[in-house]
Amino acid sequence: MRVQSFLLAATTASTLLACDKQADGPSPMAPNLAARPSGFVTSQPAQARVLLPQASLKPILTVGDPLPGQEANPDPEQRVWAPIPDGLGAYQDGNRLILFANHEITSSGVDGKFPFARVSRLQLDPATLSVTGGSYPITGKATGFLFQRLCSATFAGAAEGLGDGWFLTGEESVTGGAEGIQLAVKHDGSETRKLPALGRFAHENYIAVPGVPGKVVLVGTDDNSPAALGSSFRSELYLYVAEDAAAVLAGTGKLYVFKAGLTNSGQLTTGEPISGSFVEVTGAGALSATDLQTTVDGLGAFKFVRLEDADYDRHPGHSAGPSIYLVDTGNINARCGTDACDLFGSIYRIDLDPADPTQNAHLVLLARSRGVAAGDWASPDNIAVSGRSLMLQEDPAYAGFNRPERIWNFKLGPHGSLGDPQAVAELETEKFTGNVCLEPAGTCWESSGIIDASEWLGSGAWLFDVQAHTLPFRYQDGQNQVSLSREGGQLLYLRLPGS
């Protein structure tokens, strides 16, 4: 998932409020979908559909499509858009929109092709939503830079204290040769840094959060599963604090983990905040994923079931300091009564103290799913937050999930509360494959990577991608066409007025 970075950290509340009240009509950057594209636009049909009459969407790029500017690249896998698109991050460069995308690939690839995770960097014409260029800052081929399952992501720049900007991404895997390392890709794609000081764990996302004077603050979510590091449900919330961008990149900041009077998320009551703090994890950069888990267990870290994505609040007045929304995908096998308990997924909010983000934190359970059988959203994975609302994407993750995978919208209310959920879009799994989404049958897709794109594409604009896990795709290798049996996908534009 990913976050962008163009609201200045020192912007006044009145300016932010003005942004929040922007009109729903066209803006200077709003795309004209009827205009002749200046670059490449996929010819493939949309892999999702809207559920509301006022919403609209458009496919931009499909897995296997050619990347403009890479026609002469000797590597056929770098001439096309790679499978399993995931976390996104974007920034504006003149009249271009630069969009980074993770590709959540393992070392084995897809049918033996595309081994290891990649990061693509696309150049988009925001006026026509067409692709004018593309490349791979992380290719999946460079010795020393072979990674697995790059998941959610964030682009952080000057607003968050990271200068010209870095695309933050990390390995979700901590087994099978993966170490669970956090990465930063420079805005122009010229450099990739490993950031071991941010901790080795199953990285879902690390977001940079403005609002703490004189510090760069990052919040990380641990997407740990019982199969990875033991049998219990123990997923943690991390905080990294550094003096400036150089300190983040050099690893001279400090890593902390959240701790509270309660021990796990199953003990929370909806709407009732608890107090906690972040305790330092000494020597974090030298710890393996297993050693880090042992260390934070010893520190009494608060346990979630399986944290997923996070994003920070952009609405003024919700709290006195930085606030972060985060989701837990839950697990139907969670041991309620003895361990962290969250069967179908939850949405949380944590408020930080701007004077000292490690102290006086307040965590609140905003909503907990009752599962799809009750008509709820479920298995939340990726989120994005605008000044008006929160978007949530589902990744079907439990037996009994038996309907199309959806994107949901929650209006933000007073003090950061959530309005009633509204289903905005759903994936076209059955239309493309003939199979309904059903777990654990393995027929489900997922949408991912959603970001608020209103800054560049007009009010109510979002970008997201689809991981079409059971959909075959093709790509061109010279005179030959290569067919792969699974892991199609797509990048799409979504507009929901008022969001």
Q: How would you name each of these model-derived features?
A:
Residues 1-7:
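Bacterial N-terminal signal peptides that target proteins for export
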Residues 16-18:
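C-terminal motif of bacterial Sec signal peptides marking the signal peptidase cleavage site
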